[in-house]
Amino acid sequence: LRSLVGSEMCIRDRYTVASIDELYLFLTNTTAVEYIRNFMKRVRKKESSVILASQNLEDFNIEGIRELTKPLFSIPTHTFLFNAGNTDARFYIDTLQLEESEYELIKYPQRGACLYKCGSERYNLIVHAPDYKSKLFGDKGGR
């Protein structure tokens, strides 16, 4: 991961995006978490970004790793937050540094509804997929 993504993003002058899906697979490795955190800070200087994707916020709340993962939520300049599911509300609010009013916008599941954070600005978004994408992903939560 480090050599492939690092060299690719550093060789290009700018506008490169890397995505890490199923992030929970890396969270038990402190070296990987530190690398991801440092990498996220460096790529911003090249107008590039790293997209982190995880289904469960509680995966970041592992004893001994919590202190390393918390900064991952303050680094991104753009954040899309969807309904938290069964995650404890206080934990969700504290971890993602939300106001109560922001949490209220995504407290209940609504198809396509999310809170978009961009710097100090907040937007309540409804994401719509074009028909051709809806056919690809279906209407059963991505299946």
For every predicted segment, state its role.
Residues 13-15, 47:
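A general structural motif
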Residues 15, 21-23:
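Walker B catalytic acidic pair
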Residues 18-19, 52:
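Residue-level marker for buried hydrophobic side chains located in beta-strands
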Residues 25-36, 61-64:
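Conserved ATPase-coupling elements of RecA-like P-loop NTPase cores
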Residues 39-125:
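Conserved ATP-driven motor cores of ASCE-family P-loop NTPases powering translocation/secretion/packaging/pilus
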Residues 126-143:
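Charge-patterned, long linear interaction tracts outside catalytic cores
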